[in-house]
């Protein structure tokens, strides 16, 4: 229920708080941990925005992505100690807040670790440190990612935090544990439904682009595992021979001021162009032919275990956009091979690109462009292309509408979760006193 006894905190991100709550600077509640790890007894951990601070092996199991590997000459004795119940300021805290650790281990020296110096409910602060309003406050300490300024513990230490009595912290944390768990379970079920729809869409595409639409035509063995048998009148062709352009974008000179808009792989990794993440460069559009993005281009992510292989079809786009060097721009002669059909073929091969097509380094993995250009794909007559493309478009459109509806539900649930976290960690709402009360 709404708390009627509120006072103005005089802090913009916090707003009003209960009249019996205190405001205390972070440095009086938390202490920076400076000890270094004993690498023979502890495990290497990774801060993640979704799972908190977890072992690297668990991260790979949960996400299917490889964590950033340490360089071979890294002195592991210089790694920072972190213990269960500690908090971590990561290089991405400006985006996702501070991460909570449920494990003992070591983390990179680039991270800052801190722990409570007073008796507090750690879960209460775990929620506070992931609150969007608090994260917006953290952003004021970074100015801009392009400035390369990480969040310092000293900046956090001078930030006023809401500090209710311990029993109130306990009530809020317990209440949020239950509510957030309920929302997360709903979200998990909906996400599984989306995954099932995506798998169904993929199966339709795979069958259409490898077997065609007529089940009665004579077939032949392609000799390629992911294709299997294909129609006799189809052929295999290297990607480079059916494209008119297959090049990476530019290495932009990023600027804070508005300049030439740059499309990075992060912008389309979720299946759509997210212009909220747009960056700008001082690079003139007209002088960078190689990096220009045009309508009916295929954009292909070339870097990173979690993004590599993600693909996007540019239906229409205004003139003036450049792609960054982590994006491969693929262009075809539509009279020979449909660019959208090639996009559909690429869209079913994410795991293939993320595995076989990746060449490793100590810190990052990249698409092997030579292997990619020489990869064989099925090429069918133009009449078959048109029929297959029409068939996939119709089927995919219906499935995509269902997925969009479910994604909107996920967005609503996430916004609802964020709102109740903010309302309770800042005291604007009181924890219901009756068991089973609903807000």
Language model regions located:
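Sequence-specific dsDNA recognition surfaces
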Residues: 7-10, 27-42, 47-84, 237-252, ...
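Non-catalytic DNA-recognition/assembly elements of restriction-modification systems
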Residues: 4-41, 45, 158, 166, ...
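Short, ligand-facing micro-motifs at secondary-structure edges
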Residues: 51-66, 87-112, 123-127, 136-141, ...
């Amino acid at each position: 229920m709404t708390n009627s006894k509120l006072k103005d905190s005089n802090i913009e991100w916090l707003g009003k708080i209960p009249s019996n709550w205190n405001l205390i600077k972070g440095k009086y509640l938390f202490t920076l941990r400076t000890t270094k790890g004993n690498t023979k007894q502890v495990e290497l951990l990774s801060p993640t925005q979704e799972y908190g601070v977890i072992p690297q092996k668990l991260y790979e199991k949960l996400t299917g992505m490889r964590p950033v590997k340490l360089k071979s000459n890294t002195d592991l004795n210089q790694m920072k100690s972190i213990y269960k119940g500690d908090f971590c300021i990561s290089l991405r805290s400006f985006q996702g807040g501070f991460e909570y650790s449920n494990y003992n281990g070591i983390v990179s020296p680039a991270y800052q670790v801190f722990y409570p110096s007073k008796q507090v409910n750690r879960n209460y602060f775990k929620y506070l440190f992931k609150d969007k309003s608090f994260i917006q406050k953290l952003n004021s300490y970074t100015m801009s990612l392009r400035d390369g300024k990480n969040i310092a513990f000293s900046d956090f230490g001078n930030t006023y935090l809401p500090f209710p009595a311990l029993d109130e912290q306990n009530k809020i944390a317990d209440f949020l544990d239950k509510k957030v768990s309920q929302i997360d379970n709903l979200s998990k079920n909906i996400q599984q439904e989306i995954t099932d729809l995506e798998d169904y869409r993929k199966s339709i595409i795979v069958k259409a682009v490898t077997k065609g639409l007529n089940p009665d035509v004579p077939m032949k063995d392609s000799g390629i595992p992911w294709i299997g048998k294909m129609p006799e009148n189809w052929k295999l062709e290297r990607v480079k021979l059916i494209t008119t352009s297959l090049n990476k974008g530019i290495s932009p000179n990023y600027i804070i001021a508005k300049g030439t808009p740059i499309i990075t792989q992060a912008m389309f990794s979720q299946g759509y162009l997210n212009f909220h993440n747009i960056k700008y460069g001082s690079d003139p559009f007209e002088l960078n032919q190689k990096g220009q993005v045009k309508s009916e281009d295929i954009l292909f992510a070339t870097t990173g275990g979690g993004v590599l292989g993600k693909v996007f079809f540019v239906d229409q786009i205004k003139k003036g956009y450049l792609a960054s060097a982590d994006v491969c721009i693929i262009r075809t002669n539509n009279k020979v091979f449909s660019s959208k059909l090639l996009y559909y073929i690429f869209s079913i091969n994410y795991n293939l690109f993320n595995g076989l097509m990746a060449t490793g380094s100590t810190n990052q993995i990249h698409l092997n462009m030579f292997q990619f250009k020489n990869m064989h794909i099925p090429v069918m007559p133009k009449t078959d292309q048109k029929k297959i493309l029409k068939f996939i478009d119709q089927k995919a459109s219906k499935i995509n509408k269902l997925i969009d509806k479910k994604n909107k539900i996920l967005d609503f649930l996430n916004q609802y979760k964020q709102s109740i976290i903010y309302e309770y960690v800042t005291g604007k709402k009181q924890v219901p006193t009756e068991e089973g009360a609903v807000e």
